Amino acid sequence: MVRASAGTEKTVIAINLLAELTNRMQFVQYVSKNAAPRTVYQFKLKGHLRKNSVDNLFKGSGSYTEAPRNSVGTLLADEAHRLNEKSGMFQNIGENQIKEIIHAAACSVFFIDESQRVTLSDIGSGAEIEKGAALEKSEIIKMQLVSQFRCNGSDGYLAWLDQALEIRETANYDLDGIDYDIRICDSPAEMESIVVQKNRARNRARILAGYCWNWPKATRNNTNFHDIEIGDYSISWNLNGGDAFAISEESIHEAGCIHTSQGLEFDYTGVIIGDDMRFENGKVITDYTKRAKTDNSLKGIKTLAKKDKEKVEQIADEIIKNTYRTLMTRGMKGCYVYCTDAALAQYFKKLLKQK
């Protein structure tokens, strides 16, 4: 179990392990809940290897519901905090993805960052991995990655962000001396203009947004339909399912969400913070009722709220803040933010000493 916060290059290590162990003739697979990173790596490799060979290196986390014990040499579970209990489209297959991965592999490696759990169905935690290991009678070795490579190598930016989003108390009340370009934009058009300009160098800048706008099935491949509307500004959610969002040159004029960006990194990102987070009475407030109806990350929360409203609001608050923390840490060199809530924008500007 490898604990690693955002930017510690856990995915780079996982991919290098995949290459090294494959070179040693071991049967090894890279596993993730999120399809987006797998799609990117498959796309990059398919010019060099046969399609079947590449596809067999990368698997979804629900691939091991019936796998025999130790049938794989090593499974590298990236973004293990995103693992679910059940598998399948309707989450009704299998028993527990953590236990199934441990069962299927002689050696399983879980890369985990609990602060990136972003849906109600995410069960990946240190406690759950230990529980799965105990059930499978497996030895567990714990490690931690501490060096920060994203956000210009600045742990200070991550600590500042935790303080700003009121995720946890840190000593980082400002970004003095930290080499990271973060700006609050006065309009989404201004934010998009900066990101498009930054993208010209290497096709490594993207716009991301909180899931506060619906993504209707009927228009998901319609380039002329703009799902996100803010005043006279509009933009489409990522097209074609969004799995190639990070590498398709056309996607610079689309907005990605947590599901198409988690596990990936860019040089620069533009982030639209929607109505699910605002600043009110001196506090950063979240509101899960402002999430889009097509967003499944909080599916079932209204039913849970009838049983324990206070606990549900606490869980939703954590998920929403984790989501924006994740979106705001995808950029290695900079992040440009637009907030639909004017008070939240002013709050961030004050923290950044931005006029």
Placement of each model-derived feature along the sequence:
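Conserved lysine of the Walker
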Residues: 10-11
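Signature of the SF2 helicase/ATPase Hel1-core->accessory helical subdomain module
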Residues: 76-145
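The conserved Walker
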Residues: 6
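AAA+/P-loop NTPase substrate/partner-engagement loops
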Residues: 23-50, 60-68
